């Protein structure tokens, strides 16, 4: 399979950033995208709502179903799955995009924020994927894709920001577990993570401001890699913790200069993403 035309994606989040970029790449093929997101109205510090994202998806050539809801709420998840199936006739892909980030050290991390990261990142990934599995089983080439890193249990990352590390690794463990559990059903489940930081609001506001943004790549590189993953044969392309650049290289892309957030920035000057040595 080399196209997402007519395929239906149910994603968590997607109002902006990486999730929206992936949605727009799929929309260019004529995919259907349902987004479960909280952003019913504009955020004072963040661009985009689930409704503005839907408008962009339609303009790019896809069909959109904006669903206002919270991935922490089981009823909202059930409703999103039912609405997506009702609107588009099925679900081919689940994209676990919604994620909360807080890089605070353990003594500075509030219990509330720790729980939030666990609830959105780990539990949300599990519950949304699980709710969609009965429908994915009927899809021609079903995929689950989570935007989380490979498991790297080194002190460097476990100790840097334990709460966030556990939440992101939890997403990966859920996804790899689903890959094993539903392999016989032909459902692929993989994770995807970049080698460099991506120019998103999270990087701007929480990681490094303008300096790191200028040393990042655009979300288009993530979107192009996700597209490759989601068009692979599900029965054989599964159970992997994939790296964005490796996926593209395996697909014949060797020049990443066009993805630099600031044109002309050499690869050597880009800021490495966390969790990778």
Question: Residues of each region from the PLM?
Answer:
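Short-chain dehydrogenase/reductase
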Residues: 2-88, 101-102
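Active-site loop of short-chain dehydrogenase/reductase
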Residues: 7, 62-63, 90-91, 136-150, ...
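C-terminal helical subdomain
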Residues: 191-192, 210-277
């Amino acid at each position: 399979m080399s196209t997402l035309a007519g395929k239906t994606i149910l994603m968590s989040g997607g109002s902006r950033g990486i999730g929206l970029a992936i949605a727009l790449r799929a929309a260019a093929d004529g995919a259907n995208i349902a987004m479960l997101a909280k952003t019913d109205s504009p955020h004072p510090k963040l661009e985009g709502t689930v409704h503005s994202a839907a408008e962009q998806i339609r303009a790019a050539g896809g069909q959109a179903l904006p669903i206002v809801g919270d991935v922490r709420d089981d009823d909202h998840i059930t409703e999103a799955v039912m609405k997506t199936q009702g609107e588009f006739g099925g679900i081919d892909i689940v994209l676990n995009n919604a994620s909360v980030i807080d890089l605070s050290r353990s003594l500075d991390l509030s219990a509330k924020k720790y729980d939030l990261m666990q609830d959105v990142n780990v539990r949300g990934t599990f519950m949304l994927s699980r709710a969609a599995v009965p429908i994915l089983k009927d899809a021609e080439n079903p995929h689950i894709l989570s935007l989380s890193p490979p498991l790297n249990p080194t002190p460097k990352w476990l100790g840097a920001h334990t709460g966030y590390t556990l939440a992101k690794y939890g997403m990966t463990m859920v996804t790899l577990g689903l890959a094993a559990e539903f392999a016989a059903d032909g459902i692929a489940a993989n994770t995807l993570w970049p080698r460099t930081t991506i120019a998103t609001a999270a990087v701007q506001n929480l990681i490094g401001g303008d300096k790191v943004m200028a040393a990042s790549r655009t979300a288009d590189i993530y979107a192009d890699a996700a597209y490759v993953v989601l068009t692979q044969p599900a029965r054989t392309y599964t159970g992997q913790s994939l790296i964005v650049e490796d996926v593209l290289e395996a697909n014949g892309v060797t020049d990443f200069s066009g993805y630099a957030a600031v044109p002309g920035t050499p690869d050597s000057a880009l800021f490495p993403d966390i969790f990778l040595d």
